[in-house]
């Protein structure tokens, strides 16, 4: 059975098997997760989630053992993972994997931190769970996509539930049989529809919180003897046939289980990407390209007559020309490009400022906002067949701007094949620290040094140190 082999790997994996490169990457990912989540906790969605949890569980006492990042109190493991997961994803700045087409760190660290602090696990145990989560998560995501995503499922919610179950099972030291039961329970709870994304709701960030919650719940249930189906992934009415394949009559053997199992434990965690801009990852190549053009035209954006964006199909589908709220704005390719061309800065603070100045309203007195709207009105988004052929190994975008007669109707264009933050076009550690500082200017950055030596500490100490 497929999941039985996965469970064996999870149960047997040890810290000593990790490469230096993997350890370096996951420590950088932990730093990034903490910075994004610390800032994200001030957003509306995690605040609502936290208030809801307190409404259901209105007690704070010494028996509550897991921290909510950025808060000065503790709660239970499930609630902490749930709220931290939402906060980790709400800014659209959390890490992911290009081929697996999902966000990993938001689920993995929300799960691992809650359990590791509550049980005061060692840094080595914490890292074991984190690396196993990345390894299995990347493999499962690559196995089911792009078909799974193309059917309308948000892989971060669906496969993310399995990932959380993997991490929780490892940290709770479940044996192979218990881990298999936990993954079986994860599969029957795996959920997440991309309509939440397109609808401009908070549902998309709920997927991360619920993935962490359900994965942890599954592992605890399995530890206590609750059983789950060992064929939930590849069975006749399992995950693949109901949520991935176009036709349930397809032969399940088209999936290369042998290759997946052969590669388990060999996936390079280094292949994850880190995000620079608070927009959907599919928009980042277009943002990078627009910023290159901004460097060429400077402040002459009022002379832009029209803009054409040629990109791959999934990116082109993010063609919302009239976003009504922040959630919709983060998925709007026209606005992402226009903001880049006008202000040359794509940060959380800048986006919030533009919204305050009327970016999402029908009228504004601010010149930059009106310039952005004018560019959006003169923009076309095109799905390009040749660029689409390069996806998903590349995420290309070609942005073309035509200037007015003051510039002799000149045409500027540029193309990006892989956005900033991918392994082949990486964000360096100093850039991740700059990202952290930009999000959290009042945080004492010296607290982060504990992450460099996680192996030397227990996780309760690590959390206290990060709290400052």
Predicted feature descriptions by range:
Residues 1-101, 203-213, 220-468:
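Terminal-appendage/accessory-domain detector
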Residues 23, 27, 31, 108, ...:
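Hydrophobic face of alpha-helices
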Residues 39-40, 112-119, 165-171, 218-222, ...:
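Well-ordered alpha-helical scaffold segments within catalytic/enzyme domains
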Residues 84-142:
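Hydrophobic alpha-helical hairpins/lids featuring a short glycine-rich hinge
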Residues 88, 107-109, 114, 136, ...:
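Short connector loops/turns at beta-strand edges and beta->alpha or beta->beta junctions
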Residues 98-105, 153-158, 276:
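Short helix-coil transition sites and intra-membrane helix breaks within transmembrane domains
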Residues 106-113, 160-166, 213-217, 283-285, ...:
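Well-ordered alpha-helical segments within folded domains of soluble proteins
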Residues 117-216, 231-236:
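Glycine-rich, mobile lid/loop segments that gate access to catalytic sites or pores
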């Amino acid at each position: 059975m497929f999941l039985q082999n996965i469970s064996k790997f999870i149960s047997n994996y040890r810290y000593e098997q990790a490469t230096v490169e993997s350890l370096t990457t996951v420590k950088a990912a932990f730093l990034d997760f903490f910075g994004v989540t610390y800032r994200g906790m001030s957003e509306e969605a995690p605040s609502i989630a936290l208030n809801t949890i307190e409404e259901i569980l209105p007690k704070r006492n010494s028996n509550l053992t897991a921290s909510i990042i950025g808060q000065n109190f503790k709660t239970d493991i499930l609630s902490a993972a749930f709220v931290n997961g939402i906060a980790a994803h709400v800014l659209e700045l959390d890490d992911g994997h290009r081929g697996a087409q999902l966000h990993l760190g938001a689920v993995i660290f929300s799960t691992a931190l809650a359990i590791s602090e509550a049980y005061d696990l060692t840094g080595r145990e914490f890292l074991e769970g984190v690396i196993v989560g990345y390894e299995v998560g990347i493999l499962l995501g690559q196995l089911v996509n792009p078909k799974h995503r193309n059917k309308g499922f948000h892989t971060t919610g669906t496969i993310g539930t399995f990932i959380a179950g993997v991490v929780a099972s490892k940290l709770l030291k479940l044996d192979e049989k218990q881990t298999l039961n936990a993954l079986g329970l994860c599969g029957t709870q795996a959920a997440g529809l991309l309509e939440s994304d397109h609808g401009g709701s908070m549902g998309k960030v709920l997927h991360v919180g619920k993935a962490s919650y359900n994965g942890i719940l599954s592992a605890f249930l399995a530890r206590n003897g609750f059983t789950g189906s060992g064929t939930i992934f590849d069975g006749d009415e399992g995950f693949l046939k109901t949520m991935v394949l176009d036709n349930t009559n397809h032969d399940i053997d088209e999936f290369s289980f042998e290759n997946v199992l052969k590669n388990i434990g060999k996936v390079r965690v280094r292949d994850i990407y880190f995000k620079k801009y608070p927009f959907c990852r599919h928009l980042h190549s277009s943002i990078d390209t627009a910023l290159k053009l901004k460097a060429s035209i400077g402040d002459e954006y009022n002379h832009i007559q029209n803009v054409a964006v040629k990109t791959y199909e999934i990116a082109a589908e993010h063609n919302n020309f009239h976003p009504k709220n922040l959630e919709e704005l983060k998925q709007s390719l026209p606005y992402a490009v226009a903001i880049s061309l006008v202000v040359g800065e794509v940060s959380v603070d800048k986006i919030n400022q533009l919204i305050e100045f009327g970016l999402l309203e029908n009228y504004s007195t601010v010149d930059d906002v009106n310039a952005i709207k004018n560019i959006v009105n003169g923009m076309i988004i095109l799905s390009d067949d040749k660029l689409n052929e390069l996806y998903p190994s590349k995420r290309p975008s070609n942005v073309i701007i035509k200037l007015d007669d003051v510039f002799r109707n000149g045409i500027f264009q540029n193309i990006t094949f892989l956005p900033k933050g991918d392994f082949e076009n990486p964000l360096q550690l100093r850039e991740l620290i700059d990202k952290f500082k930009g999000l959290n200017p009042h945080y004492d950055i010296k607290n982060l040094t504990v992450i460099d030596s996680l192996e030397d500490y227990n996780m309760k100490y690590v959390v206290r140190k990060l709290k400052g």
